[in-house]
Amino acid sequence: MNVPLGGIWLWLPLLLTWLTPEVSSSWWYMRATGGSSRVMCDNVPGLVSRQRQLCHRHPDVMRAIGLGVAEWTAECQHQFRQHRWNCNTLDRDHSLFGRVLLRSSRESAFVYAISSAGVVFAITRACSQGELKSCSCDPKKKGSAKDSKGTFDWGGCSDNIDYGIKFARAFVDAKERKGKDARALMNLHNNRAGRKAVKRFLKQECKCHGVSGSCTLRTCWLAMADFRKTGDYLWRKYNGAIQVVMNQDGTGFTVANKRFKKPTKNDLVYFENSPDYCIRDREAGSLGTAGRVCNLTSRGMDSCEVMCCGRGYDTSHVTRMTKCECKFHWCCAVRCQDCLEALDVHTCKAPKSADWATPT
């Protein structure tokens, strides 16, 4: 294909996307790295100098981030549990997810957002629990304040989410800030959306003081909601993610389809359409759906028709132990019998002429 020299600028956004370097966030591998801070900081491959600097300087924060990886990957797997790609991780791959996230897809957008959110959540929680030397409860929440119910006193331990966001931005964004390509800008946008999502669900909790529990005096504090709320919110953003292209000057995005609105800071953005994830594809990083359990009665993404990509399914007759004939006994216990339950389990057939992966 011959492209006139004057048309190079029109193709630049596409070239930026195609020529994106490997972009996996190496810090995700901190989940699998134990030992001292020096061992951890020096054995996570791919950390940029700023990340290593923060790692050596704040080993307690790194431990919190490492523990948080398990939490946000579990949340990712919960949200994608009924989909062909189920956020499966690869234990021996330092990118954690393999090649699948090299594509600038919706799935990549979600993973970068949920991982960034997970760092904010993990650090903020560790601050409140007194596990970090560099932070504690929110120091700004002192004295008296007013809300719709009247005057209250700040007390207890308000979650210091501003510290969590600040550290997450410095650590997580460090690698992307070194790059000027389209994918780096996409990651930075989705990282920020993830951080903002956690703060969105910060809620005020109060305790009443007074005679017989009356609320003549209130003590209040700010607390993060359960991480599931953040996961559910980002899942909705995933389903409404906006496909974008780079501006000609390479400084920002425009929508790929002019009928859609410009993305806000809360929206997820992506460049490339997702593969169908039906078959094992090493280049795309897809493990396929062969061997995956499907739902014969569903009409959704977990249905055997959709999950198995029209290849059909195998049915196995299995038995499992369940609790049955449960009765309440005064006071205060529920006693159940152990019963064997017979059920059919449906799993997707493998492609007839393909090398396929073990069940995912």
UniProtKB/Swiss-Prot annotation:
Keyword Disulfide bond: yes
Signal peptide: 1-25
Residues carrying lipid (O-palmitoleoyl serine): 212
Transmembrane in keyword set: no
InterPro entries, per database record: Wnt, Wnt2, Wnt_C, Wnt_CS
Any GO CC annotation of this UniProt entry: cytoplasm
Subcellular locations according to the entry: Secreted, Extracellular space, Extracellular matrix; Secreted
Keywords for the protein's UniProt record, in alphabetical order: Developmental protein, Disulfide bond, Extracellular matrix, Glycoprotein, Lipoprotein, Secreted, Signal, Wnt signaling pathway
GO molecular function: cytokine activity; frizzled binding
Observed phenotype of the null mutant: Nearly complete perinatal lethality within minutes after birth, due to lung hypoplasia. About 4% survive for more than 30 days. Combined disruption of Wnt2 and Wnt2b leads to lung agenesis and loss of trachea development. In contrast, development of liver, stomach, intestine, pancreas and kidneys appears grossly normal.
Residues with glycosylation annotation: 295
Functional note: Ligand for members of the frizzled family of seven transmembrane receptors. Functions in the canonical Wnt/beta-catenin signaling pathway. Functions as a upstream regulator of FGF10 expression. Plays an important role in embryonic lung development. May contribute to embryonic brain development by regulating the proliferation of dopaminergic precursors and neurons.
Family affiliation: Belongs to the Wnt family.
Descriptive protein name: Protein Wnt-2
